[in-house]
Amino acid sequence: MLFRSERYSYHMIKETGEFVINLTTEELLRATDYCGVVSGRDVDKWEKMNLTPLASKEVSVPAIAESPINIECRVTEIKELGTHHMFLAKVVAVQADEKYLDEKGKFHLEYSKPIAYSHGTYFSLGEELGKFGYSVRKEK
């Protein structure tokens, strides 16, 4: 994770040494954008975006209950990279919303309608493009 030292989240993570990566979805798009723009110094983003704190299993900081995947992390190293600091971390727990699991326990990412952010734009994900190894399979 990369943060500028001016960011509120930078100081929270540096103080606790922990953070949670919450997978974001089309349903959470507005909250995702809002939380990326508005500082937690000024606003309770949980309340404003009607998000539910979820107790983490291994870290002291909460996850977002509405997120289909929560990845709990502990900081192992901080590297200064010019204007940003890179927080390297170890994943210590993962929680998955059971509504996206099939009967065999496989998580179906595509059902959660994940989004990605690149260069100021949000993108929808989820369309299957190919299975692992497709490039070397023999044509029938």
Where in the sequence are the language-model features?
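Basic, polyanion-binding surface patches
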Residues: 1-140
